[in-house]
Amino acid sequence: MAQESTRKVLALARKLGVIRPRDLRAAGLRREYVQRLLARGEIERIGRGLYAAPATKVSAHRSLAEVSKAAPQGVVCLLSALRYHGLTTQHPSEVWLALPSKAWRPRRTPFPVRVVYLSAGAHRAGIETQTIDGVTVRIYSPAKTVADCFKFRNKIGIDVAVEALRDYLKKHRGGVDALWRYAKICRVQRVMQPYLEAAA
């Protein structure tokens, strides 16, 4: 019985990429089986309450997967989203996460997190889902990310926002309509317009 349960835990870790205690509860498995697998080296603790099979192929964006698992309400944004989409030369030391304005900040995350709060409409707009290391990660689209960079230019720097805009226009020719739509949602049309005209 115990051996069968530990096999199920390992299978769940391989299927989901990263597992949490709530994933075990949902599958009807006890946490003690994780401890047995940890002791045998068949599973590894990658963060507080986060476990993965050691044979799991790890991507360069594993931090996004682990933080998304720890904070499912959050959306990867700003510098982290720019890095994911290849729109910056920046290497953020924190995972940037957008939360709705009334949401609680995640208390326990496996990596340092920088939180920004958005209105409900701005938070919902432009979300894409990507699978990273077997985990579904909510991340803003490239156009929404660029608009957010102008909205939070005082936090990340106007130079980063302008670099992101230029890189976006090079990679996404004809993507100005989407960019302008998100600029309206984020209320940064006036701020962004001169940079958009200069880059065109």
Annotate each language-model stretch with its function.
Residues 3-27, 33, 38, 46, ...:
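Nucleic-acid-binding surface
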